[in-house]
C-alpha cells in the first residue's frame, strides 16, 4: 500500500491588509506572513480547508 501524502506549495500573492481577522489567522496558521513567501505543506484535508478559505490570496501548486 502506498501511504505517501502529496505536498503542495503555497505562495501568498496578495496582502492580508483589510481582510477579515479570521483570514489573517489562517495565513499565520499556514506559515505565511509576507507577500511572495512560499511554504510546502502536506496535502491533508485540514490544509485544504484552510487554503479554500483564503484561496483568493494564494497561488497553489501541486508537488
Swiss-Prot record:
Part of the 50S ribosomal subunit. This is Large ribosomal subunit protein uL30. Keywords: Ribonucleoprotein, Ribosomal protein. The keyword Membrane does not apply. One of its GO terms (biological process) is translation. The keyword Ribosomal protein applies. Belongs to the universal ribosomal protein uL30 family. GO terms for cellular component: cytosolic large ribosomal subunit.
